[in-house]
């Protein structure tokens, strides 16, 4: 991931977008777990 030094100024926005994407996936996963536990109960 950190192969390229600070060459492209687009590396930071891409990393921010990737981080937000992973946060969104984590949020969906947690919500899915909560819903599944509610449905199981």
Curated annotation (Swiss-Prot):
Gene Ontology BP terms: photosynthesis
Regions crossing the membrane: 20-40
Gene Ontology annotations for the cellular component aspect, listed alphabetically: photosystem II reaction center; plasma membrane-derived thylakoid membrane
Cellular localization per UniProt: Cellular thylakoid membrane
Subcellular location, principal: membrane
Pfam families listed in its UniProt record: PsbL
Topological category with respect to the lipid bilayer: Single-pass membrane protein
Keywords of the record: Membrane, Photosynthesis, Photosystem II, Reaction center, Thylakoid, Transmembrane, Transmembrane helix
Function: One of the components of the core complex of photosystem II (PSII). PSII is a light-driven water:plastoquinone oxidoreductase that uses light energy to abstract electrons from H(2)O, generating O(2) and a proton gradient subsequently used for ATP formation. It consists of a core antenna complex that captures photons, and an electron transfer chain that converts photonic excitation into a charge separation. This subunit is found at the monomer-monomer interface and is required for correct PSII assembly and/or dimerization.
Subunit structure: PSII is composed of 1 copy each of membrane proteins PsbA, PsbB, PsbC, PsbD, PsbE, PsbF, PsbH, PsbI, PsbJ, PsbK, PsbL, PsbM, PsbT, PsbX, PsbY, PsbZ, Psb30/Ycf12, peripheral proteins PsbO, CyanoQ (PsbQ), PsbU, PsbV and a large number of cofactors. It forms dimeric complexes.
Family: Belongs to the PsbL family.
Official protein name in the record: Photosystem II reaction center protein L
Organism field: Synechococcus sp. (strain JA-3-3Ab)
Gene: psbL
